[in-house]
Structures are given as C-alpha cells and as structure tokens.
C-alpha cells in the first residue's frame, strides 16, 4: 500500500503539466485571464507556463521543493483572489441582466475559486509533509 501512496509524490506535481500544456497550446485563452491592469497578457501567459514548469521540475527533483510548493500555493491563492473571484462576482451585463451563458461563466469562475483554495491547501500540505529540501524555508 505504501508503494501506491508514494505515487502521490509524483502524480500531484506532474498533473500540473496540464496547465503548462493549456498555457502553451492555447495562449490566447490563458491571456484572456490576465487582469486588464497588467500589460502584455501573452507575456504573462508564457511566463506562467515557464514558472509552473519550474515548479514541476523542482518538485519532481526534490531540489528546493518546499519553496516551490509554498510559492505555488501563493500563486494559486493570488489567482483565486485577483482573477477568478472578481470574474465570479462581476455583473457582466449591468443592472442584473445576465444571459444564461454569462451565469454559467460566473458559476465556473466560482468553482475555480474553490478549486484554487483546495489546491493551495494541498500544496501547503505537500510543502509541510512531503518536501525534502528545506534549505530556503526550513
């Protein structure tokens, strides 16, 4: 059973490859999530892909993995607060008039908020109980 449970150390960080693929495969979609107050949305999309890839490499290689898990937790919390929550709470068409598609989009954004909060918890748990390299943040 321990051998199966130990697979989580690999499966969890490698699952983030999906996000790298989404950022690189459909950059215009990733760029559409960049808040309007940030210039150059495609730059932020590609930078995000590179940083997620750096997280994966760090987590899998167990080099600076505690720091990587903690920083990734910070990133997903910031995404929840700065991207998904404002989109979930926005009145897209003003005066309470909302199409079914807009209501569905807001619902999905709220699901993204909850998903990011759960993911941040998992990342922090991995930083505390799974990470091996404690050079930077003990």
Q: Can you describe what each PLM-predicted range is?
A:
Residues 25-37:
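Membrane-interface helix-loop junction between the first two transmembrane segments
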């Amino acid at each position: 059973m321990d051998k199966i449970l130990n697979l989580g150390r690999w499966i969890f960080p490698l699952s983030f490859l999906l996000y790298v693929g989404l950022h690189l495969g459909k950059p215009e979609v990733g760029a559409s999530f960049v808040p309007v107050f940030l210039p150059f949305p495609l730059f932020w999309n590609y930078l995000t892909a590179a940083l997620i890839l750096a997280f994966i490499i760090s987590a899998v290689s167990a080099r600076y993995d505690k720091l990587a898990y903690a920083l990734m937790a910070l990133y997903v919390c910031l995404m929840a607060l700065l991207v998904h929550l404002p989109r979930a709470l926005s009145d897209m068409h003003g005066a309470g008039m909302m199409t079914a598609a807009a209501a569905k989009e807001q619902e999905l954004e709220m699901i993204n908020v909850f998903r990011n909060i759960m993911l941040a918890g998992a990342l922090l748990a991995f930083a505390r109980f799974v990470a091996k390299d404690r050079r930077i943040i003990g």
